[in-house]
Curated annotation (Swiss-Prot):
CC per GO annotation: cytosol; Golgi apparatus; membrane
Cytoplasmic side: 1384-1409
Superkingdom per UniProt: Eukaryota
Residues the record marks as carrying a glycan: N190, N297, N322, N971
Protein name as catalogued: Vacuolar protein sorting/targeting protein 10
Gene this protein is translated from: VPS10
Organism: Paracoccidioides lutzii (strain ATCC MYA-826 / Pb01) (Paracoccidioides brasiliensis)
Main location class: Golgi
Family of this protein: Belongs to the VPS10-related sortilin family.
Keyword Membrane: yes
């Protein structure tokens, strides 16, 4: 495959052949001229048949005499249609031509005949189109994409009979692999037939298309009647975030990356069934920062990028035989930015490796501007030790893989022991053009100069012939040697041709006497391309006899004796260097001979469950050892167990008389447990020399991250900074005396945080506080309370720094300046001045450039005019684009960019600008009766369900604020009213919260006495809930009885809530810490809250605590009084502690709140200010934050770690079998819509893993809760919401907004050139989240052809012609008139309202009847159209809850860029940090970014 990257060309046109004069003592050279450069040249194995391709016109050529003569492949339909040419990697008879128009061709007889097959697929560069089975060459996967206009989706085909038949395997797969992907996969393991059929595919998550949610599915039946099973990558569990798979030798690898970290987890299997996580000797593996190298049959070689922000360097690791434990071989390997590593194994000789390393690595780590000094080293013992290359007494350095100059291997070939390279002697490697050609004929032990200047080279006849050609410019000759490169002769190219050599190659096994040279020549102003055949077959050389060969040892030890590796010595019969003969054994590769050795220490590796000790001399347990049957009745018992070693599988050493490291030894039973089970909850209290804490945040380890730390960082009221790596058991002060004034956690990567001083300089960590590095900034921080650091969502090391210059006197010349860095601040570059803020805009949902940056800049660089422009660039403002000239602010979310745009006049309403790609903006259509006066505000609530939610202020009088929630369509441009009178506070934050982990469930608090509030009365609140993403809202159903078994004072109606009797909960605006949400993404279906049952929400001091386990449909009272709560172990542990009153005890539940146990955590009463755990809620540790207040109290703030890890009920790991998910400790839970009798929610039935509440076990690392999306349901009214210019009524109906002028529904034809039709409005639109199919299509009823699209329209609707079309068009008009009159005179007073509520069967004119709904819409005369950007089909964002606020005029409250800043109370931060985002700020109070819920 390297070849098809190296030879990038136009195309070929066969022209003329030239042949040099035949001489008995020199090779025959034949040149064939082409008009364009050839690509995709390859040999069929064990043959002289060669193929290449003309990329310009798609022609394919074949030669059957090793390149002397060429013929075009003539096939019906092939002319001009070939896209690419591929050879089969293991079958020497097969090749493939992939075409442009869905037609493709395969040969099974080395291009003698071709078979055409069809597959509707387009190909793209990021995916290999052909994936081959390792042992059956007829089994092939074909991967690409299908495109319908701009809408493309991946598609994978498969064949089991060599493309005689082709079937679709799967759509939307992001890469598939056969389990048996190499010829040696599973050798010696007796694989079942199922594994031979097994295919692994990376597919999108069930609820999200983002790569962080990718799943790895496998099927043994080609996904037929089998949706696939998730691969149990991690201890039997599925893992999300799988980004790629790869096969090497006998291993299959899968790489996974969790959200909010750049660290990868690598999983390995050698049988396609059992997977293990690879461990890299404590080293982190970063995304796009590892390279799987050429490996052996018994280990994997991987180069991992060293943790440096500057020039790429790596560390070389080698695995044990099952690929699970990797040992470091050598540091500072040379890499390039493309991931290529200077590493090569010498062909067909075990254990010899040639690498390049960076000599001045310390200087390079300090600065990216330092040029690397590269040196070459070689290992003769499989990478255990390395030594310099020697040319005489001098060190030799050779150019390697990062500077490829030819196809195929860099140094070696199948010719035994012959190695060549271009380089120089001296202290380090120089430029390629300063190098000479060197050769070794003893596998790299000694080297000598072969030719001056750089040359391309190739081996033939098992090394009897070496051919070289000058590689520093044009030449008219070749050089060749017949004695291992000692002496050289020259031969001229025919007809005086002088070419620039591109490729010099020969047959893959290097056993022939023919070579191919590809190059280009200049003739006048034209470029000519040549394929030149070089043949030594007719030279007057005899055939070698027995005496012409020597037994050559492939490896020598330090005593110059044949060396042992993998239990044997290796030898070859090799032609002596100085004999005059050719071997002439064409297609017969040299066969190694082996001599067994006695077993030594090197023949053993660490056994399962063991890893190398620090000194590398022994193997120590890596985890709890399994308890032998019947052993370990007592802790002090002993048993016979593994020594920690095992013989490397495949090792052939002689046991007798050798070392026996794998002999069982006596072990004590304490080895089977790392920590004794106490059965009790552990407590650790720590006091600090400060009265309070200013804030804290978690640097959470993600599933793909190594280690087991639970890191928390706290800043006290005395500005001391502490860190704990074990969740508060041991705290350590960091940066004492350094005057840290800002702590900035990375907005998108939880491993990273910055600690800054007033000057802006400081420290940062990339590994959750394990190490800290210094950080330098280009200018001091700004003094305008603007965020100083902005982060890239996908590139961890890309930063924008907003500082200030000329500010010593704070005069008018003081202004902000933005700089950017792409290497963690090692280098800074000017971006823009007079900015308010700049942000990277790249999101996975957008196809935009990584470099896309938005900046708010004062117009004409003049802050006094108060006009902020919104600008963008994708080239660091070499060029810029102005989107808006006068904005208030903008908010970036995963799916949308929303801009608050000022009107031309001060009294004008704010406009909403929306973009989904960061390039094209459109104004959003808000309901006509919803305006945003300048002096008011709107709040961007969230955008993770294909729709944006805005809270628009209606009343902004202090203490009387409320507004309306608007919901957008899927591209954010058309909004409808979702809920009125939603409460907000003075700072603009609304009582609205999405339930985490479940689709479409949200709660909001509304003002229940709006009319009185408008007259000055205090607000009274009610809590509402939606189960269909805001389309319908209802009150919360109260419990039937309280926690003491007593009835409530009010009564419901048939178990349903009423205006007088419902459950009401205190919401977002009343929280001290905004991280204290109702729900957790880890505890599916469970929510807790404090409130009361009645007509309205009462005082918080009167609140009790409630829980729901079914997503908010039913509730129970947990305890009287108000409690703080936290979920642990994905909800299998719930802890509550009294709020605002002293206590010594907490309560915990192990069964989702059905029962509670009391636990005393302190001898002295404490006032607990907060309870916390890791943001994912997966830990069994909790932290209580508070002060002692009782008798014997100690001064200062204290933390109390409460550890449930040793609780006997939570010490055993729960078992989840992905193939039988309900067989063990889990069951499948299906959420339902409370008004849907068929159990459908958003058009499908989803099933979630939930732990059985009665099982005594712990869940552990984050569980993929969503198991499957089952049946897709037919569409019903619950899958629709009110369309634009319709609004919901109190009774659940939808009515047109009075007095509106209808929009033109034909706009869709103008906005989307591909649109064929437009539809008459019905008042309905699909909920963006729904997956329903068929059923009631309430949004698309009556179609009309777009102008000039009548023909396409009729093809789409072939029955609509002539009279039939007349009746289809005219019939509904007459029918609408008749039914409209009937409705007008007979209906129940709800004329024009379309109910989206319960689906009943009320007959012909039932309120849910499609027949009545449509005429009502027509008579109402309301036209709804989405003025949509044709940009985004569908997307989904995870559960994040940040705010980004756009305030009103000068009298409005000051901007809080996040709810964290609001919640932390700004006054507490004065003197610590100059802007809201910095100290534990906008992004630190949980994983919640300022990226998704924005107050604007």
């Amino acid at each position: 495959m390297i070849l098809r990257r190296l030879v990038l060309a136009g195309s070929l046109l066969l022209a003329t052949a030239f042949t040099s004069a035949k001489k008995a003592d020199s090779p025959i050279i034949t040149a064939t001229r082409f008009d364009h450069e050839p690509i995709n040249l390859f040999y069929f194995g064990d043959s002289d048949v060669v193929m290449l391709q003309d990329i310009k016109n798609g022609d394919v050529y074949v030669s059957r005499d090793a390149g002397v003569k060429w013929d075009m492949v003539n096939l019906d339909g092939l002319k001009g249609q070939a896209l690419s040419l591929w050879s089969h990697p293991t079958d020497r008879t097969k090749a493939y031509i992939l075409g442009k128009a869905g037609k493709h061709w395969v040969t099974n007889d080395q291009a003698k005949s071709w078979h055409e097959f069809s597959a509707d697929v387009e190909f793209f560069q990021s995916l290999y189109p052909l994936v081959f089975h390792g042992k059956d060459s007829d089994r092939v996967l074909l991967q690409g994409q299908k495109c319908f206009g701009r809408d493309c989706k991946e598609v994978t085909y498969y064949t089991t009979d060599g493309f005689k038949t082709v079937d679709i395997l799967m759509e939307n797969a992001r890469g598939c692999n056969w389990a048996v992907s190499t010829p040696i996969f599973g050798d010696g393991l007796n694989l079942s037939k199922e594994v031979n059929d097994r295919i692994f595919c990376i597919v999108p998550g069930l609820q999200s298309p983002w790569s962080d949610y990718n799943r790895l599915l496998y099927s043994d039946r080609f996904f037929k009647q089998d949706p696939g099973t998730e691969a149990p990558l991690d201890s039997g569990r599925a893992v999300s975030g799988v980004v790629r798979t790869a096969s090497v030798k006998k291993y299959l690898l899968a790489a996974a990356k969790s959200a909010r970290t750049s660290e990868l987890a690598l999983y390995v299997t050698d049988d396609g069934s059992q997977w293990h996580r690879a461990e890299f000797d404590g080293h982190r593996v970063e995304e796009d920062a590892y390279t799987v190298l050429e490996s052996t049959n018994y280990s994997i070689q991987i180069d991992v990028v060293a943790e440096t922000p500057s020039a790429p360097m790596g560390r070389l690791f080698t695995s044990n035989s099952n690929g699970t434990y990797f040992t470091r071989n050598i540091d500072h390997t040379n890499r390039n930015s493309l991931g290529f590593v200077d590493f090569e194994k010498i062909a067909n000789i075990q254990g010899i490796i040639l690498v390049n390393t960076v000599k001045n690595w310390e200087d390079v780590e300090m600065s990216a501007l330092v040029e690397k000094k590269i040196i070459s080293q070689i290992s003769f013992d499989d990478g255990r030790t390395f030594q310099p290359l020697k040319a005489g007494k001098h060190d030799l350095h050779l150019h390697s893989v990062t500077h490829l100059s030819n196809s195929g291997r860099v140094f070696s070939s199948p010719a035994p022991g012959l190695v060549m390279g271009v380089g120089n002697t001296g202290g380090h490697l120089k430029d390629y053009y300063d190098g000479d050609l060197y050769v070794s004929d003893d596998a790299g032990i000694t080297w000598r100069k072969a030719l001056d200047e750089a040359h391309k080279y190739e081996f033939g006849d098992q090394g009897s012939v070496i051919v070289a050609i000058f590689d520093e410019g044009r030449t008219g000759k070749i050089s060749y040697s017949l004695n291992h490169g000692k002496d050289w002769k020259e031969a001229s190219l025919p007809d005086g041709i002088k070419i620039r050599a591109r490729i010099l190659t020969t047959m893959p096994d290097s056993t022939g006497l023919k070579f191919l040279l590809v190059g280009s020549a200049k003739k006048d102003s034209e470029v000519e391309h040549y394929v030149i055949s070089i043949s030594f077959t007719d030279m007057e050389e005899r055939t070698c006899g027995k005496d012409d060969f020597e037994t050559w040892p492939a490896r020598l030890n330090e005593k110059n004796e044949p060396d042992c590796l993998m239990g044997h010595k290796q030898f070859y019969q090799r032609r002596k260097a100085d004999v005059d003969c050719f071997i002439k054994k064409k297609f017969q590769e040299p066969v190694p001979q082996f001599e067994p050795c006695k077993c030594t220490v090197e023949d053993f590796e660490c056994d399962f469950n063991f890893i190398r000790s620090t000194d590398g001399k022994s193997c120590v347990p890596a985890r709890n050892l399994p308890v032998p049957e019947g052993a370990c009745k007592k802790p002090d018992d002993k048993y016979m167990g593994s020594s920690g070693f095992r013989l490397i599988p495949g090792n052939a050493c002689i046991r007798e008389g050798g070392v026996e490291l794998d002999k069982q030894i006596e072990r004590v039973c304490t080895d089977t447990l790392t920590v004794p089970v106490s059965g009790e909850i552990a407590v650790q209290k720590t006091f600090f020399t400060a009265d309070n804490y200013k804030g804290y945040f978690y640097l959470e380890r993600k599933d793909s991250s190594k280690g087991d730390d639970e890191t928390v960082i706290m800043i006290t009221s005395e500005l001391q900074i502490y860190i704990t790596r074990d969740h508060g058991k041991i705290w350590k002060e960091i940066f004492p005396g350094e005057s840290i004034t800002r702590i900035v956690p990375h907005q998108y990567f939880d491993d990273v945080a910055y600690f800054l001083t007033n000057s802006g300089d400081g420290w940062y960590t990339l590994d959750r506080g394990e190490n800290f590095r210094t950080f330098k900034v280009p200018i001091p921080p700004n003094q305008d309370k603007l965020p100083v650091l902005s982060f890239h969502p996908e590139r961890r090391d890309w930063l924008i720094w907003t500082g200030a210059v000329e500010c010593k006197t704070r005069g008018p010349q003081c202004h902000s300046v933005a700089y950017y860095s792409t290497n963690h601040g090692s280098e800074w570059h000017f971006l823009m001045q007079y900015v308010r803020r700049c942000e990277f805009i790249k999101r996975e949902a957008r196809g935009s450039s990584n470099n896309l940056v938005f900046c708010e800049q004062f117009e004409n660089e003049n802050p006094l005019n108060h006009h902020l422009q919104l600008l963008s660039t994708d080239d660091w403002f070499s060029e810029k684009k102005v989107h808006y000239n006068n904005i208030l602010d903008f908010a970036t979310m995963q799916e949308f960019i929303i801009v608050a745009v000022r009107g031309e006049k001060p009294q004008d309403s704010l406009s909403v600008g929306v973009s989904v790609d960061g390039e094209t903006f459109a104004y959003a259509d808000l309901p006509a009766n919803v305006q945003i006066p300048v002096q008011r505000a709107y709040t961007v609530l969230e955008s993770r369900t294909h729709a944006a939610f805005l809270h628009v202020t209606v009343n902004n009088i202090e203490d009387h604020e409320y507004g309306s929630i608007l919901k957008s369509n899927s591209n954010g441009t058309s909004y409808v009213l979702s809920l009125s009178a939603v409460n907000r506070n003075t700072y603009g934050y609304a009582d609205f919260e999405k339930m985490q982990g479940m689709e479409g469930v949200a709660m909001a608090n509304v003002v229940g006495n709006v009319a009185d509030v408008e007259k000055g009365a205090a607000k009274k609140y009610r809590t509402m809930i939606t189960h269909n993403d805001g389309a319908e809202w209802t009150l919360l159903s109260p419990p039937s009885k309280d926690s003491e078994g007593r009835d409530y004072s009010c009564s419901t109606k048939g178990g349903k809530p009423t205006d007088k009797c419902a459950l009401h909960l205190h919401s977002y605006t009343e929280r001290v810490d905004p991280r204290d949400t109702y729900s957790s993404p880890a505890a599916i279906g469970v929510m807790l809250g404090t409130g009361n049952v009645g007509e309205y929400l009462t005082l918080k001091s009167e609140a009790d605590t409630f829980i729901t386990r079914d997503g908010g449909i039913t509730w129970e009272e947990v305890k009287k009084d108000k409690y703080q709560w936290e979920f642990g172990d994905s909800g299998s542990i719930i802890v509550i502690v009294p709020e605002s009153r002293p206590t010594k005890t907490l309560f915990y539940s192990l069964d989702e709140g059905k029962s509670w146990k009391e636990f005393q955590f302190s001898e002295v009463e404490m006032l607990i200010r907060d309870i916390s755990t890791v943001p994912s809620d997966t830990s069994r540790n909790f932290l209580l934050w508070g002060n002692e207040v009782g008798n014997g109290k100690k001064p200062g703030i204290a933390t109390v770690n409460v550890d449930f890890s040793n609780l006997k009920e939570r010490h055993k790991q729960c078992v989840l079998n992905e193939e039988k998910p309900e067989a063990d400790d889990y069951y499948l839970w299906e959420p339902i819509h409370p008004f849907q009798p068929n159990g459908c929610l958003f058009g499908h039935r989803a099933k979630y893993h939930r732990k059985r509440p009665d099982r005594d076990c712990f869940i552990g690392r984050e569980l993929q809760h969503l198991d499957s999306i089952g049946d897709i349901c037919e569409c019903t009214r619950s899958d629709y919401e009110c369309d634009y210019n319709y609004e919901p009524q109190i009774d659940g109906t939808c009515a047109p907004v009075p007095g509106l002028q209808p929009l033109d529904p034909k706009l869709i034809c103008m906005e989307d050139p591909k649109a064929v039709e437009w539809y008459e409005p019905t008042g309905y639109r699909r909920i963006p989240l729904t997956k329903c199919e068929g059923g009631k299509q309430l949004h698309h009823i009556i179609p009309h052809a777009c102008p000039n699209k009548e023909e396409e329209f009729l093809k789409k609707h072939p029955g609509l012609r002539g009279v039939g079309l007349f009746f289809v068009v005219m019939g509904p008009i007459g029918l609408a008139a008749a039914i409209g009159y009937y409705v007008y005179t007979r209906w129940d007073g709800k004329f024009g309202r379309i109910r989206l509520g319960d689906t009943g069967s009320g007959g012909f004119f039932a309120s849910d009847s499609l027949f009545i709904s449509i005429p009502v819409a027509i008579v109402a005369g309301v036209v709804a159209v989405a003025t949509a950007l044709p940009l985004l089909a569908s997307s989904l964002w995870r559960s994040v809850k940040g705010y980004a606020r756009v305030p009103g005029g000068s009298s409005s409250q000051r901007v809080y860029s996040s709810r964290a800043a609001f919640a932390a109370q700004r006054a507490d931060y004065v003197g610590v940090v100059d802007d809201e985002d910095e100290l534990l700020g906008a992004e630190d109070f949980d994983e919640e970014e300022n990226d998704d819920r924005g107050q604007v």
